Amino acid sequence: TPDPGTPSTPEIEGTVTCTFVGGVASNSSFTVKGSQTNKKSATIDGTTYESGLKFDSNGSVSFSIKKKMTMTMYFASDDKKCTALINGKKTSETGAVVDTTKHTLTVVLEADDYTLTKQDTGNLFMIKLVPVTE
């Protein structure tokens, strides 16, 4: 039985997105640390975001998934390196695909708890999780 004083984190189900306007997670399934950036922007699926999360030594995003999902991280339009440490592993160690034209990092994640932290300094605007159908 959960402690009634501790709100439970909603389970991530189906396709989920989380933006970081003001440096705050738009989805309560995600825990964010760090500060906002409003000096950069990102255009994602036709929508321009003017505020995101500084992905520096203080920035991190944590979440849990109960099934295999594809994660896409969307970085600022002028970020040259779209990388992240995923549970301490470098992008090259996770099988992630970085697209520096679209400013994304995409990787398949197994059911687990995840913490995303800085590999190279950047600006994170959105995370999208999509269930993998096998």
Model-assigned labels for residue ranges:
Residues 1-13:
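Ser/Thr/Gly/Pro-rich low-complexity, disordered linker/stalk segments of secreted
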Residues 10-58:
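Glycan-recognition and processing domains
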Residues 44-67, 78-81, 101-105, 122-126:
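Short beta-strands within extracellular/lumenal beta-sheet-rich domains
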Residues 59, 67-71, 111-113:
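Short tyrosine-centred short linear motifs in exposed loops/low-complexity segments
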Residues 72-76:
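Short edge beta-strand/loop segments characteristic of extracellular beta-sandwich folds
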Residues 79-90:
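Short, surface-exposed beta-strand/strand-loop-strand elements in extracellular ectodomains
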Residues 89-111:
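Extracellular carbohydrate recognition and processing domains
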Residues 115-123:
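Short beta-strand-plus-loop segments that form exposed binding edges in beta-rich domains
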